[in-house]
Amino acid sequence: MENLPNHEENDDVGYHQSPGPIDPNDHSASETPVYSTMSTDSFAYHRTCSETSGGGFSDQIDETSSFCTEASPSDWPVLTESNNSASSNFPTVFDLKHNQIETDEHLAVQEISEPELETMKERFSKLLLGEDMSGSGKGVCTAVTISNAITNLYATVFGQNLRLEPLEIEQKTTWKREMNCLLSVCDYIFEFIPKSQNLSNGATVEVMESRPRADIYINLPALRKLDSMLMEALDSFQKTEFWYAEEGSLSMKSTRSATGSFRKVIVQRKEEKWWLPIPLVPLQGLSEKARKQLKSKRESTNQIHKAAMAINSSILGEMDIPDSYMATLPKSGKASTGDAIYRHMTSSGRFSPEKLLDRLKIVSEHEALQLADRVEASMYTWRRKACLNNSKSSWNMVKDLMSITERSDKNYVLAERAESLLFCLKQRYPELSQTSLDICKIHCNKDVGKAVLESYSRVLEGLAFNIVAWIDDVLYVDKTMRGEE
């Protein structure tokens, strides 16, 4: 087995060397998921459309090569490995800072056994066949397969991680190695742009130049950075003043907070989250320093959550609306919204989505999600009617796009009001699960690049939300123990 370096230049993108023999054809794939929300996260937050699977996409990659078996055709530094000799001669501050962590992670990587190799071959075959092992050609498209693989990898690595504590070294290594394999497909997604080129005779010609697609070039490095920040956040919870006790397993010594924080945390949580471990703090509560550190980490992680959510919403917004979704829309928008909401939206007075939401008195996020589905369906129903009523030639449509006549169309006005209502609803419930349209877009999407970005941002969004919720648990227990509530 070859020697492992202590520090490498590329650990910021989550790459670690495998000392074992490598077969470039040996990969693995995720288990076949079902499009339903998973419930391994904290509280009632669901942003994934694949159930937890025991499988993951495992592979071993040579340190001196690119993420794929052949050299990457792009000059994209984020997705390409660099020379290790240079990094060893000129170690960076990042290398020195994470030297000990890297050494521990490398020591955890063992040679792949024969059963593991066979499992990897089987899973990779399943990935290539679009999750259809029968070979009958009924598998899903590549985009959906990769999206499911990322979702299932997240569930495998983080599904049992329900505490504020560092990931085990093997889990962290698996996550970084397998994500690099799944993300390496983006090395080969390009767009062509015109570029002027001067010839030797002085003439100027226009040629097409390839470059990484704009959405991947912008969003993928950002997601990698968010991923790294979340791993650092978990690693920071090594020596803490709080600890955990599983519900129902509290001993007499650990029940010193049962009369205060233990029961109140149960009340604060959803009843269906009974399996989550209970955070415990000293009788006098956390120290001021520990409390400030927790609040600071909560704020930074919350910003990561917002960034991942913004990227995910942007990618979903760029996906085409599937014809299958449009075919299921009712003929009337009123049938989707219901009589009460429709009367308020068609009233002659000034429409206020905030007042409408106050009148509806939504008591749960489940009700909010149902309302979002109905409002979104009515919005596209009215938009479709507005297009049919204002069908014109292409030139006239461009000329009169924002005309007063079109603005006064009833369907157009109702569609705008439905859009504003949906926007306010999502603002009031920022952790709302994905709507039926979002899930349909993911299921019908055939763009591999968008599938990678959407699934990667979605799982990071879920992880960030969980960390924030776990920190809130600890702060709530601390507040209760100090007698502030």
Swiss-Prot record:
The PRONE (plant-specific Rop nucleotide exchanger) domain is responsible for the GEF activity. Interacts with ARC10/ROP11. Residues 107-485 form the PRONE domain. InterPro entries: PRONE_dom, RopGEF. Keywords: Guanine-nucleotide releasing factor. This is Rop guanine nucleotide exchange factor 2. Pfam families: PRONE (PF03759). Residues 1-36 are annotated as: Disordered. The keyword Glycoprotein does not apply. Guanine-nucleotide exchange factor (GEF) that acts as an activator of Rop (Rho of plants) GTPases by promoting the exchange of GDP for GTP. GO terms for molecular function: guanyl-nucleotide exchange factor activity. Expressed in the vascular tissues of roots, leaves, sepals, petals and siliques. The keyword Protein biosynthesis does not apply.
